[in-house]
Amino acid sequence: MPSDAPSSLASTRNIGIMAHIDAGKTTTTERILFYTGVNYKIGEVHEGGATMDWMEQEQERGITITSAATTCIWRDHTINIIDTPGHVDFTVEVERSLRVLDGAVAVFDAVAGVEPQSETVWKQADRYNVPRIAFVNKMDRVGAEFHRCVDMMVERLDATPAVIQLPWGVESDFRGVIDLIRMKGLLWKSEDKGASYEVVDIPRDHLEAAQEWRDKLLETVAENDDELMELYLEGEEPSEEQLMAGLRRGTLASKINPVLCGSAFKNKGVQPMLDAVVDFLPNPLDIGATIGHSVSDEDAEVRREPSEDEPFSALAFKIMSDPYVGKLTYIRVYSGRLTGGSPVLNSTKDRKERIGRILQMHANHREDRDGVGAGQIVAVVGLKNTTTGDTLCDPNAPVILESMTFPAPVIHVAIEPKTKADQQKLGTAIQRLAEEDPTFQVRTDEETGQTIIAGMGELHLDVLVDRMRREYGVEANVGKPQVAYRETIRRKVEKVDYTHKKQTGGSGQYARVIINLEPSGGDGGGYEFENKVTGGRIPREYIPSVDAGCQEAMEFGVLAGYPLVDVKVTLLDGQYHDVDSSELAFKIAGSMAFKDAARKADPVLLEPLMAVEVTTPEDHMGDVIGDLNSRRGQIQAMEERGGSRIVRAQVPLSEMFGYVGDLRSKTSGRASYSMQFDSYAEVPGNVAKEIIAKARGE
């Protein structure tokens, strides 16, 4: 951080910039860095020169893959910005950055409006209760419609937009914005790349609309703020300060979302958006105490106030490998103060760690810091055992902060090294990448011995394989993408009795267990284990072994060897032998009892369903719908948007491979689509038979 940076909590903002792919998010961040004086040359995404997109693949693909954290100063406030990816395959990046942010700027495309990934990200932000302002970008583009975008925020996001700016002109005539708080026009100058703008009176032909929208603004804010409601009912006009204060209170309470507009690419509207970040988004003090729990008791609540006088606590939200300094762990400090070289406790794993260096990150260059206090986001070097979602804290005042939830992968491929020399490197690369990305999973196929990598989509795995090649020099052959099917059960089976016995001279093995198995009604990741054994029929030290055996059996289902999910095991009874019983014997008994029970419990196959949205010209509508139906798709909605037709459907992932090429040829390249994981559902009988036969090699 620059040495003159204000460090007080009240003047700190930790924000994310979130949006759909291509809404102009990275360009917006670049402009922020330019106007706050961090960059001297503006980087353009389509030239591959954006500061935030610093990985090679991002510069080639023009999309943001990892959320880089950058610090800048505006109006004597420190703004820590996390640039998040908008592509659905990288949802994990958005999820983890929202957990550590205090506020966010949602960037929308004025032409496309609220797109599917915008909805996903908005709902993620709702879940973490992150206050947001909205920036309607690309106002200079043909087909830009500000008001339709605002309407879509209401319809699709269930938001309460408080419009504080109107566009001045539209498309190629877009010149600036009309500020409804100050009732002034703002015009940008092109000669200094939009670094300065003129404040002018609102032109006559815009005055009526401005007055009408200002009245709407006052009404929206008053409806969500008691203080302004009183003024409103008395017919009094609030002062600029009162209106700003009401907007801030409403935004912090997540009741309203101030909406601004502009064109980041054309350098218009970025500074007022930065003003809105400072004026309306929360500082760490507004967010208040972070709630965690005691290390010894999950139900015992522990509070950590955002103050440097409190004991140190922080959350590790991202791991990255840096070619120069090694493993970087990004942390958000919630309380206390951290200095370089100090010992900390990783309370999640109960391991002591030592902080080496503390680094303030600017997209891809870094600055050493001696220490860092509550409310800041930095990267630290020297942590050996810390992974995403772990809590770091003062060893004398342990606490575990709320972690993050990550979706399970939906697609997997087999990967093998091209040469013997690549074998070792592949292992290292996979281990490092799995450390960085919790949604990237690795396992070995027991039958074929192949290494299987799994992720959130084809692009996700492409990028990971690409990184193996570039960063670790691994040349690998990658198989065809396979769908991550799962299995579950449909009915309860009771008192399944299994005895594991092996008594052939010497010490034998003996364990008997009796279990119930039933569906747990979860949504894809559920497993419950309940122990109802009484009277010491199975000694207490063997109970975890039965649980472990059941969990091991779940990894390979009874139908086709896919993981079994959403089950509850109840251990009812059993027997042990003084000499021959062991942890291993009970683990095997648990595993075999589970498999027996699963076979009897009406097992079924589950497949991932994707929410697909296709944008197509009207004359290709029939072809698109026919094609989706042929892929076992269920059409859920159709609507018109700016001369195009939108088809929303739910389609099994297994039917979507190669869809991009088929859609192109059916619509002469005029249609586009986006898809994201929706849910798991039962595979129809005839299709399931084929999948099971294939998995069994029949």
Swiss-Prot record:
Belongs to the TRAFAC class translation factor GTPase superfamily. Classic translation factor GTPase family. EF-G/EF-2 subfamily. Coiled coil: none annotated. HAMAP family: EF_G_EF_2_B. The keyword Disulfide bond does not apply. GO terms for molecular function: GTP binding; GTPase activity; translation elongation factor activity. It comes from Frankia alni (strain DSM 45986 / CECT 9034 / ACN14a). InterPro entries: EF-G-like_DII, EFG_II, EFG_III, EFG_III/V, EFG_IV, EFG_V, EFG_V-like, G_TR_CS. SMART domains: EFG_C, EFG_IV. This is Elongation factor G.
